[in-house]
Structures are given as structure tokens and as C-alpha cells.
Amino acid sequence: MTLEKELILRLNVGHNTVIRDVQLWREFEDGDGQIAVKNCLAEVVGMVNIDKLPFWLNRGQRYQCFTTSETSVNYFRAKLMRQRHRNRGIVCKVTGSQVLTKEQFEYFLFYKRLKTDINASFEIESMVLHLSTKHELDKKLIPLSADELQSVVPSNAGATMSIESILEKNKRQRILKSNSLNKQVLLNDQQQQFMSLLSQCILSGLRLRGVHRTQHEKLYKMTYKASEFAFRDELRETEPISFESIQDCVETLLKLFTKT
């Protein structure tokens, strides 16, 4: 048996971040010949507790994970190698490949494993998850009779969600969280731009009116606070506030405050 590289992943980990050169190696028979290395895209869809995974997942192919990318090393170190993450697994879905089919690779599970060497160090492994295996097992289940169903008391009611539902829920949560973060970033950017334009308009208006230094600071603060209040609704939206609107507001306030 020889350890050969079979796959190279580009992994979308969320928030427009993609880590590269995630190499998956596994053992092949010596007579298997040259192994063609395949490239594919994948995305993280959720985190799971590997101690609570169903037994049928252990039937998948197993890989050792390597990389030459410092960014990829840091990602897996932060997500899997810390003590508080000792039972964590990362579920990834294959999203694009020119050579792989859904039957070959659908999901990957990344987790850490204690190496069986003298150093007793950890390494990252990956396992292929085939939901088709679960579907086949589901078909072979013997249905219970009505009497048997009544006598069965579920020990963990509500916890029988399929792995497909869990993964889909995790994906929706990630999308909602990402959208919320993106909106907050846009709001912060708009507020910074508004503050800068507002300050420029007020200072320019005060200079044009030749306001005395003793009144300068007081008028600036009054105009600034009044303008913020006037645009309070617009500042809750991601649509930028135009320079002309800010300038008109400042001019109106300065005319009122200076009676010019």
C-alpha cells in the first residue's frame, strides 16, 4: 500500500474567503498504477459533533489532509486543533468539478485524529459522506406495526432529523448570518461617508458666512446634531445619502441659526 494524492480542494469557508491547496491523500494498492489528481470546489456547510454521527458514515473513504498553504493550515488549526473543539467536525459539500460525479463525492467531513506514532501528535483526516448509503439503509428498514409503534417510547423526540435537513439548516443559517454581516458593513460604510460629507458641508458653510471663532464650535455642533436627526431614517438604510441632500439640509439649518 502506498499513500497517494487523489484530490485538491479549493474550499469556500464563508464571508467570501476561499482557502486553497487542501490536498487529500489515501492509500492505494501498489498495482493500481498512476493516480490522476483531481481538482474540485467545495464549501463549508456546517459543524457537527463527531461523537454523535450515525454509524453508516463510517463506510466512507478516508483521507489524510495536507497543504502547502499557510492560510489553510491556520484555518484548520483554529477550527479543529484547539482543545475546546476536540469533538468537532467540519462538513463540506462539493460544489464544482469537471471530473467528479455526485455518486463519487457529495460531502466531506474533516476532523482531527491522534496519529499512531511515537510523538502522539494530531493530524487532520477527511472522510467521504455518501447520503446514498443512508437512503439504501432506509429502504431496508422493516416497518413497525401499529401496536409496535404505540409501544415505542422515543428516547429523544424531535432529534430524528435527517442529516440532509441538518446540513440544509446550517447552510441557511450561514447565508442569513452572512447577509446580516454584509448589511452591517454597508451601514457602517454609509455612516462614515455621511459623517465626512456632513462635516465638510458645515465647515464650508461656516467659512462662507465668516462666522466668528467664538461661535464656530457651538454652531458646528448644533448643525451636526440637527442634521443627524434629520437623516435618522435614511441612516438605517443601505442606500447612500446624496451630497446634494446633505448640503441642502446644512444650508437650511445655517440660515436658521445665523439668520442669514
Swiss-Prot record:
Keywords: Cell cycle, Cytoplasm, Cytoskeleton, DNA replication, Nucleus. The keyword Ribosomal protein does not apply. It is found in: Nucleus; Cytoplasm, Cytoskeleton, Spindle pole. GO terms for cellular component: cytoplasm; nucleus; spindle pole. InterPro entries: Sld7, Sld7_C, Sld7_N. The keyword Cell cycle applies. Pfam families: Sld7_C (PF18596), Sld7_N (PF18636). It comes from the Eukaryota. GO terms for biological process: DNA replication; regulation of DNA-templated DNA replication initiation. Required for the proper initiation of DNA replication. Required for mitochondrial morphology. Belongs to the SLD7 family. This is Mitochondrial morphogenesis protein SLD7. It comes from Kluyveromyces lactis (strain ATCC 8585 / CBS 2359 / DSM 70799 / NBRC 1267 / NRRL Y-1140 / WM37) (Yeast).
